[in-house]
A protein has these predicted regions:
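A short, solvent-exposed beta-strand micro-motif common in secreted/extracellular proteins
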Residues: 62, 80-99
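C-terminal motif of bacterial Sec signal peptides marking the signal peptidase cleavage site
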Residues: 18-21
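Extracellular carbohydrate-recognition regions
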Residues: 123-158, 282-289
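Extra-cytoplasmic beta-strand recognition segments
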Residues: 142-143, 193-217, 252, 288
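Short carbohydrate-recognition loop motifs
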Residues: 159-188
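Secreted extracellular polysaccharide-interacting domains
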Residues: 179-206, 228-239
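Structured interaction patches on ligand/partner-binding surfaces of diverse proteins
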Residues: 95-127
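Extracellular carbohydrate recognition and processing domains
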Residues: 230-264, 278-279
Length: 293
C-alpha cells in the first residue's frame, strides 16, 4: 500500500511536470496578430449599374504568399508582424453554389498597409469597384419601363420578362418578372439581341443578377450559326436558382460554355417552369449585367 507521504510526493511531482510542460509549450507556441474584416462593399460609376453585390469571402495575399480564403465577416489569425503589404480580393459563390467559391475577376483588388502586432486586432471596412477593363455587354435594370428580355422562345406573349412597379421591386422604380401559369406552364425567354461569340477558352464571362421567385429558373445560352432571326438555335443550360421569398444576388459563369461552342452568335436564355400544385408563379429579376474583358 502507498503511504500518505509517497502519495504527496507523487502528487507534487505530477503537478511540477504539468506546469513544466505548459511552460515549455507556451514558450514555443507563436502568438498571432489578427485582421478583422467586417464588410466588403461595391462602388460603381454611372454607366456600371447598381451597387448590389454578394461578396461572401475574401482572398488574402501578402507580398509573397496566398494566406487563405475566409468567409465574411472574418477575424483572421496571422503569424505576421510589423508593417505588411496585403492584397485583398473579393470572393463570390460561382453559380450560387457554396462549393464553388471564386475571387471575382471583375472587381479591383484592395491593397492595404497594416502594422500587425501580436494579439492586436486591426479592423478594416473595404470598398471595391469594377476594373476599368470590364466590358458591360448590357445592363438591364428595367428603369426605362421596358425589357431587354422580351424575345419569346416558348410561352405566351404575356410571359416575357415584363417590367413592373409594386412593393416587390428590388430597388428604384421598376424590376422585371416572368409569370408562368396553367395556360403556359413552361416559359423560355431570351435577350432581344444576338451577340457575337468571340470568347476564347479561359476568358471570364459572367451574368450578374438580383432575383427572387415562386418558381425555379434555369439560365442558359441559345447558340446560332447565323444572324437569321428564323434560325431556331441550340439551347445549352448552364445553371439556375431555386425558389426564394427574398431577393438574392447571384453570379453565373458563362465563360466555359461560350468558349467551347463554335457558333457565331448567342442569346442569354431564362427558362422557368410552374411548380406542381401551383396555379401561377412569378420570378423576379433586377440589375442583370453581362460582363467580360
Amino acid at each position: 500500500m502507498i503511504s500518505l507521504k509517497h502519495k504527496l510526493v507523487l502528487f507534487y511531482f505530477l503537478l511540477l511536470l504539468t506546469f513544466s510542460s505548459c511552460s515549455f509549450l507556451n514558450q514555443n507556441e507563436p502568438i498571432p496578430s489578427y485582421l478583422y474584416i467586417s464588410e466588403f462593399r461595391l462602388k460603381t460609376q454611372a454607366n456600371q449599374g447598381s451597387t448590389s453585390e454578394r461578396i461572401t469571402d475574401i482572398w488574402l495575399f501578402n507580398d509573397t504568399d496566398f494566406l487563405g480564403m475566409f468567409p465574411l465577416p472574418a477575424k483572421i489569425p496571422l503569424l505576421l508582424y510589423g508593417e505588411q503589404n496585403l492584397t485583398i480580393q473579393a470572393g463570390i459563390k460561382e453559380n450560387g453554389i457554396g462549393a464553388t467559391p471564386e475571387n471575382y475577376p471583375f472587381f479591383n483588388p484592395i491593397k492595404v498597409k497594416v502594422n500587425l502586432k501580436a494579439l492586436k486586432t486591426d479592423t478594416l471596412k473595404l470598398e471595391t469597384s469594377y476594373l476599368s477593363t470590364s466590358k458591360f455587354h448590357f445592363i438591364e435594370n428595367f428603369e426605362n419601363n421596358s425589357s431587354f428580355f422580351s424575345f419569346l422562345v416558348s410561352g405566351l406573349p404575356e410571359n416575357r420578362v415584363l417590367p413592373y412597379s409594386d412593393n416587390n421591386v428590388f430597388e428604384g422604380k421598376f424590376s422585371g418578372k416572368i409569370q408562368v401559369s396553367k395556360s403556359a406552364p413552361i416559359v423560355t425567354v431570351g435577350s432581344n439581341a444576338k451577340y457575337k461569340n468571340t470568347f476564347n477558352p479561359g476568358q471570364p464571362v459572367y451574368l450578374e443578377m438580383d432575383y427572387k421567385g415562386e418558381a425555379p429558373c434555369v439560365i442558359g445560352v441559345q447558340f446560332y450559326d447565323t444572324e437569321n432571326i428564323e434560325e431556331a438555335g441550340i439551347i445549352v443550360p448552364i445553371a439556375g436558382f431555386k425558389e426564394s421569398a427574398d431577393w438574392k444576388k447571384i453570379y453565373f459563369n458563362l465563360g466555359s460554355t461560350l468558349a467551347l461552342r463554335k457558333s457565331l452568335y448567342y442569346r442569354v436564355i431564362f427558362n422557368t417552369a410552374l411548380p406542381e400544385g401551383k396555379e401561377n408563379a412569378n420570378v423576379h429579376f433586377d440589375n442583370i449585367k453581362l460582363i467580360s474583358f
